[in-house]
Amino acid sequence: MARGNRRNGSRRGSGTTGSSGSSRGRNNKNRGRGGSSSTSRRAANGGKRAGAGKFNAPELMDLDFGAIDDVNMGTGSMRSLSKRPGRNTMMQEAFLTSKHTDRFVGEPLRKRPIEFIKAKEVYDPRAILEKVINKDEANDADEATDITVSLRETTIAEQNEDNVNLDHDENEKENEKEDVEDQKPVEKDEESKDNLEGLREAIENDEKVKSAKIDDETLEQPTIEMEDSDNEDDSQSDSEGFFIDTSAQPTNSPPAYVPPNDIGPNIDYDPVLTIGNVQLHTSGAGNDITASVRSSTHHDELDSLDEFSDSESDEDAYADYIRQLNEQDSSEELSSSDSENESASTDANVSSTNSPQIVEYGFLSEDYEFDVSQISVTNVRFGIKNQFYSRCLELTGSVDDYMWVDEDDLIDFVTSKGVKEHRLESFLSYITNGMINKTENDEEEEQEVYVSSDSESDREIYGGTAPEIEEDDDGIADLVAFSKSSTKFRDTIDTSAVGTTGKGSRKQLDLERFAQYELDDDIIDSLQQQYKIRRESKKSKKQQHQDELMEEGLNKYNLLLKYPYTLHIKDIKDEFESFLHNPARDDLSFPPLDPHGNKTLTKMAKCYNCKSATQGKGIRRYIRVSKYKRTFKYLPDYGHINAILRQRPVFNRVDQKRPKEEYIATDGNATKDRIRQRNKSGHNAYIPEGHIVGGMAPEIDHTNVGRQLLEKLGWVKGEGLGAHGNKGISEPLVATVKKSKTGLGQTRY
C-alpha cells in the first residue's frame, strides 16, 4: 500500500516532488520535440545559436571564435539579397540564355533571314579623312603664321634697338667732326658730290631689288652679334677716312671704299628652324615671306645721310652698307651650296637603299631543268594549308582534270623534278601567273572596265528604256556591263575524267576513248605505270598516317587509336595493370562497347578498387575508370579477375565497323557462301499458284495390283466405288495450289 502511495504520489506530484515531476515531464515533452540539451545551451548563450550571428552572414564566420558580432552592416545578408524574389536565379538565367543561343545557332540559315536596311547617311570614310586632314593643315598653317609674325616682330624690335645705338654713336662722331671742322674747315668738291649722288642712287636701286627677296638668315641671326664686327669696321673706316689736314689748302677726297670682309660672322647655320612642334625651312627654296626686314634700317640710314652729307661720315656709312650687302650675298651662296649638297646626299642614299629585285623565273639557266608545261594552275586557295587548283598527270593522275593539291606536295614534287629551293618563290609566282604576289596596276584595270558616260549608252544596255539612276545607285550600270563583258572569261570547259577498269590489283586506266588519237604503246604503258605508282604512293601515305596515329595513341594512352575495332579480355587486363602501376595517370577511358562489354569493364574496375562511370550517349557510350583512396590501400582481387578472364574473350567496338578483310578472316565470307549454296546441283521444285496437284499424272496401268483387285470386286472405269445403290462420286476431288493470303472466293483460275 505504501508502495502504491509512493507510486501515486510520484505520479500526481504532491508538494516539491510533484512539481519536480511535472517539470521533468515538460522537459521530456520538449525532448521529444527537439531535445532540451540544445535549448538549455542556447539559453545559456543568450538565445543565440553557435555560428549564427545577428546578420546571418556565413561569409563572416570565424571557425575558431564563432560569429563576428561587432560588424556594422545592414539587416539583409548577401544570401538573402541574392534570392531576388519573383525572378529567376542567375544560374537559371544563364542556362536559359545558353538554351536560346543553342537553339538559335542550331536553326538552318533559311530560318534566319538577313535583312538589309538602307542607311540614312552615306558613310564615306575617304571624305571624312579628307575633312580631318584639311582641318589639321589649316591649324598648322595658322600656327606657323603666328610663329612667323611673332618672330618677325621680335627681329624688328631688336633691329630698332641696334639702330638707336647706332644713331647714338653717329651723333657722338658728328659732334667730334663738328669740333674738328670748327677748327679747320674743309671745302667740298663738286666732283665728290656727283659721285656721292650716283652711289646713293645705285644703293637705292640695289635696296629695292634686295627687298623683294626673302632673307630667312636675318630672322635667325641676331643683330647683337653683328655689332662687334660693325664697330670694328667703323673704327677701321674712321682710321682710314678721318684725318686732320694741317695745311690750309683744300683737298679733294674721293669716297673711301672698304674691301669686303671674307671672314663671315661666327654664326651657326641650321637649314631647319624648330619652334615647338613647328619646323621652318630657312633655305631659299622654302621661303614664303615677301617683305624684307632690313629695309627700314636702310631707309633710316638714307634719311640720315641727308642731314650729315656735309661731313665725311657719309662716305663711311656708304662703305659700311656695301660691305653688309656683300656679306649677305656670300652667306646666301653658302646656304644654297649646302642645300645642294644635302639634296645630292639624300639622292645618293635613296639610290643606295634600293633593294635588289628577284629575277623572274625562266631567265636563269637552272630554271630549264624542269618542264614547266607539265603543271597548270588556275586558282589558289589560302588557309592553314595553301592549295593550288592544278592539273598535272603525275600529281592528279589525269591530263584534263583539275584538282586541289597542297602546297607541300607541290613543292616536294617540283623539287624532286629539278627546281631549286632558292627559286621556289619565283617559280610559284610564275605558275600562278602573279596570283600570289600580284602587283596592282590601276591603269590597266581602268582600261578593262567599261564606263558609260552618257544616257544614250545606258539606253542601249537596257534595250532603249533606261531606268532613272539615283545618286546612290551610281555605277551599278557599269558593274552590270562589266559582268556581261567578262562572262566569257568565266565559262568553264566541259571535261571528263579518265575512267578506270578492273578491281583491286588489276585496276588500271581506261584509255579506249583515246583510241582516235592513235597513242603509241610506249605512251600507254607510261600512263599505266604512272597511275600504278600514284596508287602505291597513296596507299603508302595512308599506311604511314595510320602508323603515326597508332604511335600517337600509344604515347598518349589513347585506347581509341590503339584498339580501332576489337578488344580482347587480356588486353583489358593489361590496360588495368598499366593504369594501376602508373602514378602519373588518374583516369582511363575505354572505347565504346556493347552493354555486356561495359558491364565487364565495370566488374574489372571494381576488382582493381577503382571507380567506374558511364559517359556519352547512344553507340558512343563508354566507361571511364578513375583512381580514388581505396585504390592505394587495397590490392586487386586477382581471384575474381581470373574468373572474368575465363568468360567472354572478345569485345567488338560498337562505334566502328570492322574492315572486310578482318571479318572475312574470322567469320568467313558470307557472300561467297550464299553463291555456293545457290550454285549447288538440283533445284527446289517450284509450283505456281492455281496448279492442280496430280493433274498431269498418267493413268494407273492394268498391270497394277490395286486396279486388278478393284476390277475383281466389280469396279468399272468411269464409275464410283461402292455397292449398288451406295456408290461414291465418279469424278475425283481436285487439289489446287494456294500461296496468296486472300480467301478461297477471291481466287480465280
Swiss-Prot record:
A molecular function (GO) term: nucleic acid binding
Domain R3H: 566-629
Compositional bias ranges of the Low complexity kind: 11-25, 36-56, 327-338
Entry's localization field: Cytoplasm; Nucleus
Compositionally biased spans, kind Acidic residues: 225-237, 303-315
Chain ranges of the G-patch domain: 702-749
Keyword rRNA processing among UniProt keywords: no
Keyword terms: Cytoplasm, mRNA processing, mRNA splicing, Nucleus
Region named Disordered: 1-56, 153-265, 289-315, 327-353, 441-461
GO cellular component, one term: cytoplasm
Compositional bias of kind Polar residues: 344-353
Biased composition (Basic residues): 1-10
Taxonomy, superkingdom: Eukaryota
GO BP field: mRNA processing; RNA splicing
Basic and acidic residues composition-biased segments: 165-216
Main location: cytoplasm
Cross-referenced PROSITE patterns: G_PATCH (PS50174), R3H (PS51061)
Function in brief: May be involved in splicing.
Family of this protein: Belongs to the SQS1 family.
Protein name, entry field: Protein SQS1
